[in-house]
């Protein structure tokens, strides 16, 4: 399974409530926060929903 590094690059202020909840469920609280997660189908769905707010990179293990 691949690891993904996810960074919040745009503000969640003024976004749809379900998009804000999705970003928070990823563990991102404020701009330029970075988290790493294993790539799963559930994660890919979340990333697709809020892709316009994020920068996603694959991490080499």
Curated annotation (Swiss-Prot):
Keywords per UniProt: Ribonucleoprotein, Ribosomal protein
Assigned GO CC terms: cytosolic large ribosomal subunit
GO MF, one example: structural constituent of ribosome
Coiled coil stretches, renumbered: none
Cleaved signal peptide residues: none
One Pfam family named in its UniProt record: Ribosomal_L30
Segments crossing the lipid bilayer: none
Sequence similarity: Belongs to the universal ribosomal protein uL30 family.
Binding partners and assembly: Part of the 50S ribosomal subunit.
Protein name: Large ribosomal subunit protein uL30
Organism whose genome encodes this protein: Fusobacterium nucleatum subsp. nucleatum (strain ATCC 25586 / DSM 15643 / BCRC 10681 / CIP 101130 / JCM 8532 / KCTC 2640 / LMG 13131 / VPI 4355)
